[in-house]
């Protein structure tokens, strides 16, 4: 008669397999970024000679020993004395990466602040107020989430052109002032806030705006941080719309500036990778600072409202 497996052993096996799968997934996700960082520290000749290695030759012990003994090595040409951060410095001095980074920061920051304000007010109206056609309007709002961004590109450009905002700061940020996903996310979160708090505030003489500012928003910090992070990331990574609406290089964000940088540098990949690493640092910093709110905001917003 076959005895059942030990439950503790089964639990350990499941945990082991889960660890292995997650470790493989982590390697798949981290490897491209590690490759980009390693390539950004190489010279142009080093990258052309060895595109596969993650570690530049100057950091490899074997190549260092060969160079010290006078043997033929990858450090025999300009690699030994090449400053480690030269690609980063050249990107700022010659490639205007600092200007592109500042533009991206301004665009993403302004869009995030305005979209949080507009979406929070709209979500509060859908979640806490009752008016005629509320369900129909909300359904139409959700339907806009099914439209591909490419479909809206021409109508948005026509509107921006009619307003005379082509090739300007406001022309870039105007289409991002509101979003259906943000309204939906915040509405779901607002509907989970106990209604007794709002009723008690109204008994004390608070109006709708005061309730929104002093009760709803403070209790919705996880959802607001989550939406702010998603909005900032979308604005930071935006490429097609700035490319369409801008022609002055002084207004270029980093995403568009990188394509220009590639043409000017003659496909100097180490320098391009260095600019890409600099462009990724703000998003990484934001995720590290807001990660404890991220999962909570999404999970609580997805709960069924009572």
Predicted regions and their residues:
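A structural signal for multi-pass alpha-helical bundles of membrane permease subunits
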Residues: 2-306
């Amino acid at each position: 008669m076959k005895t059942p497996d030990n439950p503790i052993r089964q639990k350990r096996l499941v945990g082991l397999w889960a660890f292995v799968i997650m470790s493989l997934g982590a390697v798949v996700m981290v490897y491209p970024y590690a490759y980009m960082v390693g390539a950004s520290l190489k010279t142009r000749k080093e990258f052309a000679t060895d595109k596969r290695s993650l570690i530049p030759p100057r950091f490899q012990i074997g190549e260092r020993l060969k160079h010290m003994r006078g043997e033929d090595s990858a450090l025999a040409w300009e690699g030994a004395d090449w400053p480690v951060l030269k690609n980063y410095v050249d990107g700022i001095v010659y490639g205007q990466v600092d200007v592109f980074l500042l533009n991206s920061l301004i665009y993403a920051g302004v869009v995030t602040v305005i979209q949080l304000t507009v979406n929070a007010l709209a979500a509060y109206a859908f979640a806490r107020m009752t008016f005629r056609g509320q369900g129909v309007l909300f359904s139409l709002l959700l339907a806009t989430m099914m439209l591909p961004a490419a479909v809206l590109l021409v109508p948005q450009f026509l509107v921006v052109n009619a307003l005379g905002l082509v090739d300007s700061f406001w022309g870039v940020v105007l289409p991002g002032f509101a979003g259906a996903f943000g309204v939906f996310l915040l509405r779901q979160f607002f509907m989970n806030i106990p209604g007794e708090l709002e009723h008690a505030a109204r008994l004390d003489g608070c109006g709708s705006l005061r309730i929104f500012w002093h009760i709803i928003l403070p209790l919705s910090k996880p959802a607001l941080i989550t939406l702010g992070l998603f909005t900032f990331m979308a604005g930071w990574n935006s490429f097609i719309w700035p490319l369409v609406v801008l022609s002055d290089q002084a207004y270029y964000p980093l995403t568009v500036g990188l394509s220009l940088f590639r043409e000017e540098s003659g496909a100097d990949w180490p320098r391009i990778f260095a600019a890409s690493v600099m462009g990724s640092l703000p998003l990484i910093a934001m995720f590290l600072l807001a990660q404890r709110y991220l999962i909570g905001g999404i999970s609580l917003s997805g709960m069924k409202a009572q």
